[in-house]
Each structure stands twice: as C-alpha cells, then as structure tokens.
C-alpha cells in the first residue's frame, strides 16, 4: 500500500507547530514539533515533523544532536548546511542560557544540581577536562573555569591553577568537575589522589572543596558521596 504523507501546511491550524506555539506556548510542544519549527520544511514523502522525529530517534534525542558533528548532520537527507547551522546555533543558545541563568537557577544544593549544570556539555567531550565551579557564601555560581585539558595525572595537574580564579573572585568554595570520555564515570585511583591534593590546597587557602564530580555518558559520580578522597587516606 502506498503511504500517505500530509504536509504541515495541509494540517489543521490547531496541529501546526508554529500555531500551537503561538496559542499554547513553547512548553506545550513535543520535541519533534520544536525541531520541526527549526527545520521549517521536510523532504519528499516526509513532512518537517516526521523528519524531526526521525532525527531525534536516530541521534538519541537532544543530547545526541548536540554531540553530533556538523558534517555528520549536514550530510543527512533533508538537512544540509543551512539547517544544520540553525540547529547547532539553537542548541548552543540553550547551552549558554543554562550556563548564564539567574542566581536562583544556579544555587547549588546538591551534587545533582552541579551535575545538571555541567553534564550537557561535558558528557560529549572527546578529551578529559578539569573544571572548577566557583561558589559564593550562599553556594551560588560565580564562574565556571576550565583549568586543565588532558588526562588527570598528578604529575600533570597544577593544583595552584585550580585556585587562581576562586582567589580572584573571593570564592567561599569550589566544586571540581572532570569528565571521562569513555562514558564510565567510575573514579580512578589517580582521581582520588588528585582530589586529596585539591582538598589539602583548599584548606590552606581557606576555600572549601565541596565535591569532585566525575561526568560520564548520562551518569555522574560524586566522590564526596562515595567517600573517595574526602575521608582520611
């Protein structure tokens, strides 16, 4: 049987993504509808909503689209460079909005709060990065600083670099975060050693090290919760 595909312009007004956004707000739209608005048009035999749904399934949702390379997306049927550029720009706007939101959004109350702040970007990095979240006396984010790029070895990481920005900002505390490109967030023995060194340096500088998070693929480990590096050696 020949499949029958309805173009978006042939849908009832109440089913068109842009009209639904106007009448009900963006939060009411499904992921495929939001993506369809960016794509604008579909391809032969597939409207923009269906194309959007296919992309979301193929790449594993928004995180997968964020991780996908520009060329990988642009070569997909129905995409091309213009649509890929629009999509990548929209995803980057969302990432920057998350990182630059108001104080209330970025009040860190738990390891989960800190992980949610960092996971979107750091879970898809292809190199290890060590970052420090600088916090004020109310645990509000002051700045997120990239300290080091490369494998986390005690001989390579300069502990003093971690505290340069917290000292400048007069931070009360920091949360250290690094990623495992393998996707497995299990802390290594080197991670534990580095954590102890960072905590000791923080004590000397009167800057509390609240936690060290290891980010993996959709998962994270709080080394404080595991008692790794935060207890007695």
Curated annotation (Swiss-Prot):
A single BP term in Gene Ontology: proteolysis
Motif (JAMM motif): 178-191
SUPFAM superfamilies per record: RuvA domain 2-like
Positions of the MPN domain: 107-229
PROSITE patterns: MPN, UPF0758
Entry annotated with the keyword Protease: yes
Gene Ontology terms, MF aspect: metal ion binding; metallopeptidase activity
Alphabetized InterPro entries for the sequence: MPN (IPR037518), RadC_JAB (IPR025657), RuvA_2-like (IPR010994), UPF0758 (IPR001405), UPF0758_CS (IPR020891), UPF0758_N (IPR046778)
Keyword Protease found: yes
Entry keywords, A to Z: Hydrolase, Metal-binding, Metalloprotease, Protease, Zinc
Binding annotation for Zn(2+): 178, 180, 191
NCBIfam families: PRK00024.1 (NF000642), radc (TIGR00608)
Protein family per UniProt: Belongs to the UPF0758 family.
Name the UniProt record assigns to this protein: UPF0758 protein RoseRS_0767
